[in-house]
Amino acid sequence: MTSNRVMIVTSATEDSLQSVLDAIAGAGGGEIGHYTHCSFTVAGSGTFKPGVGADPHVGIVGEINRVPEFRIETFCGRDQAKGMVQAIRAAHPYEEPVIYLIPLLDEHDL
C-alpha cells in the first residue's frame, strides 16, 4: 500500500491566513475533481516560547506566548508535497512554521 496523497496541516495568524491559503492553492494544493482551494480552517490558539536569537512575528522573546491562530488542513499529491512546503514557508510570517505531512490512505487501499 503506497499513499499517493498527503494531508498537510499548518497554522497561521489571522493577518497571514489568506496569504498562506493562496500559497497552498497556487502550489496545487486542495484540488478535488473540478474543485480548487479546498481546505478546512478552524480557530484556536498557538503557544510558544521564543528563545535567545529568535525574531518572532508575534509574541515576546523569553516569555510563553499564546496567540490566536487558525489551523489549516488541506491535501495534495505526494509528488506535490515538497513544493507545497516551500510555498507555505515562503508565504508564512513565522520563522519556524509548523507543517505536518500525513500520508493518506486511498479508498482503493481499504
Which residues are covered by each model-predicted region?
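Hydrophobic structural segments
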Residues: 1-110
